């Protein structure tokens, strides 16, 4: 009998804020400093929508600890929640290379990292992430990183992905954020603009990429996880 592949899947649960908060409440709780950072960002930063979601934080904590990660990279720091999450998830020997191009938001991140007592774990690099990643490669750090989180300028994602693949070890994980673009990736009538074009292209590229095992999860605005095979 010829095998047929399903082409249409159904949503099992229609998510809303009540369900989201129930799930968060039944996960490892954020620390007081993480909650304070989130509240500060929502109250003081106009573009607070860029903040990593709470459910992502608990998810990344679990991934980092399952990997027994010692070396991570955070591409796109904003006010520092994702870097803080990684630093808290690792032991004292853990290190985070935090990549951003501006101090406008990272100046706040530095304060929260210090308050949490993890600032010594985080190396903030204020320059294009592609430059930082290439410097790490040039310093002989290929195949040594355990976890990379990409959440920065969408048109740069392909470059960050390729450089991260060189830096990640076999079995390490790259997490790529905003791969659903608020559902626009699946909407044929969506306004085509550079961010959407870049994300659609990367999604298709990763799907066909035989260097990695991959899964796309509808968490927050969509997260793709890839792990390097070779």
Curated annotation (Swiss-Prot):
Disulfide bonds: none annotated. The gene is omt5. The keyword Lipid biosynthesis does not apply. One of its GO terms (biological process) is methylation. The lineage of its organism: Eukaryota, Amoebozoa, Evosea, Eumycetozoa, Dictyostelia. S-adenosyl-L-methionine binds at residues 52, 74, 76-77, 82, 100, 129, 151, 153, 160. This is Probable caffeoyl-CoA O-methyltransferase 1. It catalyses: (E)-caffeoyl-CoA + S-adenosyl-L-methionine = (E)-feruloyl-CoA + S-adenosyl-L-homocysteine + H(+). It comes from the Eukaryota. It comes from Dictyostelium discoideum (Social amoeba). The keyword Secreted does not apply. Keywords: Metal-binding, Methyltransferase, S-adenosyl-L-methionine, Transferase. Its EC number is 2.1.1.104. A divalent metal cation binds at residues 151, 177-178. Belongs to the class I-like SAM-binding methyltransferase superfamily. Cation-dependent O-methyltransferase family. CCoAMT subfamily.
């Amino acid at each position: 009998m010829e095998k047929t592949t399903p082409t249409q899947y159904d949503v099992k649960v229609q998510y809303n804020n009540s369900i989201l908060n129930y799930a968060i409440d039944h996960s490892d709780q954020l620390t007081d400093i993480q909650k304070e950072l989130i509240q500060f960002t929502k109250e003081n930063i106009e573009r607070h929508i860029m903040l990593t979601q709470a459910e992502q934080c608990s998810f990344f904590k679990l991934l980092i600890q399952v990997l027994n990660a010692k070396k991570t990279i955070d591409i796109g720091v904003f006010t520092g929640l994702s870097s803080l999450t990684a630093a808290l998830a690792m032991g004292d020997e853990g290190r985070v290379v935090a990549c951003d191009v501006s101090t406008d938001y990272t100046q706040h991140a530095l304060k929260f990292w210090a308050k949490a007592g993890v600032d010594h774990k985080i190396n903030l690099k204020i320059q294009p992430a592609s430059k930082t990643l290439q410097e790490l490669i040039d310093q002989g750090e290929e195949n040594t990183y355990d976890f990379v989180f990409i959440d920065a300028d969408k048109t740069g994602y392909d470059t960050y992905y390729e450089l991260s693949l060189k830096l990640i070890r076999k079995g390490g994980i790259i997490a790529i954020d905003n791969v659903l673009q608020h559902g626009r990736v699946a909407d044929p009538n969506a306004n085509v603009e550079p961010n959407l074009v870049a994300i659609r292209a990367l999604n298709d590229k990763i799907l066909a990429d035989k260097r990695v095992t991959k899964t796309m999860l509808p968490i927050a605005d969509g997260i793709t996880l890839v792990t390097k095979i070779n």
